[in-house]
A protein has these predicted regions:
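Short, well-ordered coil/turn segments that N-cap beta-strands
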Residues: 4-6, 33-35, 67-73, 134-139, ...
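Carbohydrate-binding surfaces of carbohydrate-active enzymes
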Residues: 191-194, 222, 230, 234, ...
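Aromatic-lined substrate-binding rim segments of carbohydrate-active enzymes
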Residues: 24-30, 39-96, 225-231
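Polysaccharide-binding and catalytic clefts of secreted carbohydrate-active enzymes
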Residues: 98-268, 272-279, 283-285
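Short, acidic/polar
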Residues: 17-29, 250-261, 318-325
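Short, solvent-exposed turn/loop segments enriched in Gly/Ser/Thr/Pro and often Arg
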Residues: 13-15, 40-43, 76-85, 139-148, ...
């Protein structure tokens, strides 16, 4: 997929603002040379405060103002953080995991196989799409947000797992032999008596369940994409902000998602890349994670989230924002988008700083963003859709990752697949050797 210009912008939340300043914000965004915002993905309860009662006031304010200031918009489906009324009416929606039953409050606490969740998620996606489909400024759609299976072990998930195993192993004796289930009397001779997967001591069977959980994510994306495709125009794209294994920052391959398979229903891969800054800014995370993103579909990608200031010690030194933006673009990104425009005034991410601080006034970061944005207005058409010719490829896959993590290199060490993966990537990065990461399975 090709673009005419580099997309440069921010995530924006009118619904989080302490007071009305949307005109001021969008003028500042435009004046900074930014040309895109992402909206809507986090606030299902704002769009549907009660079951069947919808209020898209903030959505239309953002879309109307974006059109006025000639900003492109990416709309996210708001299904990763469920409203309280949904959890109260259908408590089974809250996931059952290896650690027990989830409580309401934090995000991504639901069972993505639960039929009541899927029913209501489809309703809010369709209602949202009906609201945005006629806006020319909407250029694309982000499916959900940093999706994973959330370790769902619900009755629905486990029933699906048994059906998955029956399809993979029509002969139950073959299944028992393949996984060595005579050990400790773990043998299963009746599919209807299949034990709760959370109790297994068989690492191979546990690895198979993790593979199945990754398939749940792939199926979830395909399901959402089919809904969105009923409304999207031919000139609009579908993407997702894939994330990475987290070591206080984006580190390596995401163990819980087969990103190669999950992205097949999308037009372009997207990702979220967060990394240390100041004296710890090395470029390694931007390169390693960007290479993973580029390998998902073997093409350019979108950085749907990266930090402007971000975590407490990450306030960038002067010039680092520009260095970071150019690094993303040089690695094949067609978009660089900050999470987020304004620092949030309450809740858990209050001090994950945006472009603007809590006083919402122009600052050093805003001025540096303005330099980047206005440079990209001049030269972005020459930098977009950059291709890299790689002499080396690294085959990286979830099956190897899961296997190595299940059967550890050293029980006294925290080293895992991604640790070894990064040793290799970082060494080659320091040697200025460009890599492509690819799946062991050929692409369609």
């Amino acid at each position: 997929m090709n673009f005419n210009e580099i997309l440069y912008g921010v995530a924006y939340y009118d619904e989080y603002m302490p007071y009305d300043r949307i005109e001021t914000d969008f003028k500042m965004i435009r004046d900074a040379g930014m040309n895109v915002i992402r909206i809507a993905e986090s606030t299902w309860s704002t769009w549907e405060p009660e079951e069947g009662v919808f209020d898209f006031t903030h959505l239309h304010r953002m879309l109307d103002c974006a059109a006025k200031y000639e900003l492109n918009v990416i709309v996210g489906t708001p299904t990763y953080a469920i409203p309280s009324w949904l959890a109260k009416k259908y408590p089974d929606i809250l996931a059952v995991t290896h650690n027990g039953k989830e409580l309401y409050g934090h995000r991504q606490n639901m069972d993505i196989t639960n039929p009541d969740y899927l029913h209501h998620a489809q309703i809010i996606i369709e209602k949202l799409m009906e609201q945005v489909k006629d806006y020319d400024c909407v250029i694309g759609f982000q499916l959900d947000n940093e999706t994973k299976p959330y370790d769902t072990c619900s009755k629905y998930a486990q029933a699906k797992f048994v059906e998955y195993l029956k399809n993979e192993f029509p002969d139950i004796d073959e299944f028992n032999r393949e996984f060595g289930l005579d050990y400790w009397s773990n043998r299963v001779d009746d599919w209807d008596a299949f034990p709760d997967i959370r109790g297994t001591i068989n690492m191979s069977l546990d690895a198979e369940y993790k593979k199945f959980q990754r398939k749940l994510v792939t199926d979830f994306f395909a399901w959402q994409a089919d809904i969105v495709k009923k409304y999207k125009r031919d000139d609009q794209f579908i993407t997702h902000n894939f994330d990475f294994e987290w070591h206080d920052y984006s580190y390596g391959m995401q163990p819980e998602v087969n990103q190669y398979e999950a992205a097949k229903c999308m037009d372009i891969a997207g990702c979220d890349i967060y990394h240390p800054s100041q004296s710890s800014l090395s470029g390694r995370e931007i390169t390693a994670c960007g290479n993973i993103a580029r390998g998902i579909k073997g093409d350019n990608y979108l950085v749907l989230e990266t930090e402007a200031a971000g975590n407490h010690p990450w306030l960038p030194y002067p010039g680092q924002l520009r260095l970071q933006a150019i690094s993303h673009i040089a690695n094949g990104a067609c978009m660089v988008e900050y999470w987020h425009w304004h620092s949030i005034h309450n809740a858990i991410e209050s001090y994950w700083k945006g472009v603007l601080s809590h006083d919402l006034r122009p600052n050093r970061l805003y001025k540096e963003c303005s330099v980047i944005g206005n440079e990209l207005k001049k030269y972005g058409h020459r930098l977009v859709n950059l291709k890299k010719t790689n002499k080396f490829a690294v085959i990286a896959d979830n099956a190897s990752l899961t296997g190595l993590n299940e059967f550890k290199l050293n029980n006294e060490s925290d080293s895992n697949y991604n640790t070894v993966f990064r040793w290799l990537c970082d060494a080659l990065y320091l040697m200025n050797i460009c890599l492509l990461y690819t799946s062991p399975s050929p692409r369609d």
